[in-house]
């Protein structure tokens, strides 16, 4: 607005955002309903400072489904088409397990996460993250003697083999992925587990390598769960990428002023990032949503990002 010579106060802009989020909340709720019907959900969380909030540390949680890329229109009518791309943010005043349980509402599908214990208290089947496990060994590698290879190098190289398999089977169907993982990745995982068990007895438990080994062993059942279903991923990078736009934004605006503002941010970020994940221009999509929602339609499914037909703009 300022570039067009229109001066708007911070209060006015904030009020507009709050009102806009209220209008878009029905879309958010419908996306939430559909997300809980999916077989796999990825989740992550990040701190958020809220000035007028009793809690010293609040959090923005993210939950996402879908392949992390715009849908292929050629597969729109296929029975095995990928699940819808949905990215939803959920503002909470804590990082407790109750936050996850409230959002998931008894969801019993697969939940792919890092090793944070709050997720353990859900009804979901947890899937681990090899990217997190690998980072522990990268940290251990940094404290090795310079110029010498050690245990961390072996694990990093071994995990790299697992990722190369994933790159090679990326375009396969879920059924093909499952079969190929069991054929090619399972033997490598068995080797890794044997190495971890043996090495855990050879290193100081409080050393960097000892902590890395202990983390992988604690997470092992979750780490190898991606073998069970071809729809699962080897890591939780899907959620980490989904929460990154919010983290980048937070570096610019630093905090939310009120809990109402934080909740509005959750709705607005959700609509914007879900639009982007489905190949839509957020501004055009939100403009269309506001125009159509003003008509108070009986159903809003035709307005969801993978169903909507945006009007052509004539210049």
Residue ranges and their predicted role:
Residues 1-315:
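Catalytic center-proximal scaffold of phosphoryl-transfer enzymes
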